[in-house]
Amino acid sequence: MADKKRYEELINILDQYSYDYYVIDNPTVEDAEYDQKMQELLKIEEAHPEWVTPESPSKRVGGEVLEGFKKVAHDTPMLSLANAFNQEDLADFDRRIRDKVGDDIAYMCELKIDGLAVSLQYENGKYKQGATRGDGTIGEDITANLRTIRSIPMKLQKDYSIEVRGEAFMPKRSFQKLNEIREEEGQMLFANPRNAAAGSLRQLDTKIAASRNLDIFLYAVADFGEMGVETHSAGLDMLETLGLKVNKERRLCNSLEEVYAYIEEWTEKRAGLAYDIDGIVLKLNNLEQQRQMGNTVKSPRWSIAYKFPAEEVPTKLLDIELNVGRTGVITPTAVLEPVRVAGTTVSRASLHNEDLITEKDIRIGDTVLIKKAGDIIPEVIKSITEKRSGSEEPFHMPKNCPACDSELVRLEEEVALRCINPKCPAQIKEGLIHFVSRNAMNIDGLGEKVIIQLFSQHLIKDVADLFFLSKEKLLELERMGEKSVTNLLASIQASKQNSLEKLLFGLGIRHVGAKAAKSLAIHFDTMDNLKVADKETLTSINDIGEKMADSIVTYFANEEVHDLLEELKRAGVNMTYTGPKLEDMSEEELVFTGKTVVLTGKLEKLTRNDAKALIESLGGNVSGSVSKKTDVVVAGSDAGSKLAKAEELAIPIWSEEDLIEYLPDEGGLNE
């Protein structure tokens, strides 16, 4: 008969075996011996379930089925990092550091793992909770799934109570095996290891998470200072002594030249790693100097992520298709011979507008170079003209809409061509898809395919029709069974109670994003008040600029809009603001309301006018100079004296990417 002492001994032995194998990559026993001891442990646990603790090695194989993922607050925010794309960006970062703390500095350089940022909490040395980064303040509880990662110790070598940050990832070999299995089973393949890791950690069945063979590198403690160390490098060393897995390829650099050499080395060697990396992270090593530098709204001033240059890959441009957005903008899209770029297969890419196609002389049949902007959005960089055979065809934008044949127009100060026919079926369809989306009316079960079916079968012609759908009609649709239809109708019914801002955003009024919709709802309280507001009243609201005000007035002057609103009222859709009033709202919810914002440097994705309009739509006032009254500086590349002054005055600095997070769904302000 087993005794508890033997049980505890087995736990310690198996923990040590796991540490040797998964953390320090130095296995000390054969698999057969590990399996024999694990079986012995499992038999004891079967006989004595009262002895089993959450730290038992048996918990790593999964088996628990979760109901969902609850939200958890991070005691210390998990900030994102500002990006650097070249040596000039790094030199600017270094200058800001030296201006603030002097020249006696060193940088800890670490590989930027391409995975999922997570937080691990240990209480008295025992693993207590694991969470995703989420929005940096609130994440999701994935404790059970993280427990299945063998390189995460359930007990530390010392009884510390700490919160550790790291990057969970799927090794390349595990990713390849997983996709091979999925292909054999006829399942959709994962695009890249990052997506596979994220999907694995959000499995409700922990056995599935356990089968995915994830790994982790830990790179920080929420507050290293609590551990009695003075430098980041010493903190990483201490994490290793606690039994945590820290990446060995880190290097302490005493100059920018050493940083550049480290980057160059890993730019060349990255392909040979067992896992994906997408850059190098620099951290000011001295913790006191880190505290002196402080943080911006989104990121620490003492750290930066150098992003590897986007991979550029040649492929064939087979065709150029035209897409009609919900506001009528005609967007050309490149149809490509499928090719792998930055870990995913790309068969379509953005061409932005006609002017860009003409300027770059891109022709159908060309061999073109493509890359992923920010490693996310595929785009065509240029044609490789020396590979032309003479059969390539220049592209010309049509004069009429590809969806409704109406004449296309180019509005003043706009680059894009636009269809202005309010009856255009493509615009109506895209508008319906937008209306039911998460940030708008959030109607579960009404995905794009269902909307297309409903529209093509003439069951809906506008958003009001959604609220008059019958069970009988829905059951006639493909892949819509009794349960799906019941759930969908319940979701439609629930959406009627949404607060006014959700409806306003869903209506797709030109230039009105989610944040502006909320400000309008708060200010006017009811749809009836808003629809009679004049331009002067609208522009008196901090969030609303002249262009947006004109758009709102024009929208509500349309008799068809009045008819639509009456139909929505008849359906029982709420048209009153039911959320917290302005005085009760947090600063985070208000974003830029009442704040002065300065733009500086070169923006890569937004025009200066777009950025200004977006800031105004979020309630901010754009100023041309930095002063003590400035609340936020949005800095692009090549930012000069304004950025330096903002740093000197300790003004929060946003990147262009931070600002883009608040774009309306269609991604543009001139649409």
From Swiss-Prot:
SMART domains: BRCT (SM00292), HhH1 (SM00278), LIGANc (SM00532). The active site is at K112. InterPro entries: BRCT_dom (IPR001357), BRCT_dom_sf (IPR036420), DisA/LigA_HHH (IPR041663), DNA_ligase (IPR001679), DNA_ligase_CS (IPR033136), DNAligase_adenylation (IPR013839), DNAligase_N (IPR013840), Hlx-hairpin-Hlx_DNA-bd_motif (IPR003583). Keywords: DNA damage, DNA repair, DNA replication, Ligase, Magnesium, Manganese, Metal-binding, NAD, Zinc. One of its GO terms (molecular function) is DNA ligase (NAD+) activity. Zn(2+) binds at C401, C404, C419, C424. It catalyses: NAD(+) + (deoxyribonucleotide)n-3'-hydroxyl + 5'-phospho-(deoxyribonucleotide)m = (deoxyribonucleotide)n+m + AMP + beta-nicotinamide D-nucleotide. Its cofactor is Mg(2+); Mn(2+). CDD domains: BRCT_DNA_ligase_like, LIGANc. NAD(+) binds at D31, A32, E33, Y34, D35, S80, L81, E110, R133, E167, K283, K307. DNA ligase that catalyzes the formation of phosphodiester linkages between 5'-phosphoryl and 3'-hydroxyl groups in double-stranded DNA using NAD as a coenzyme and as the energy source for the reaction. It is essential for DNA replication and repair of damaged DNA. Belongs to the NAD-dependent DNA ligase family. LigA subfamily. This is DNA ligase. It comes from Listeria monocytogenes serotype 4b (strain F2365). The gene is ligA.
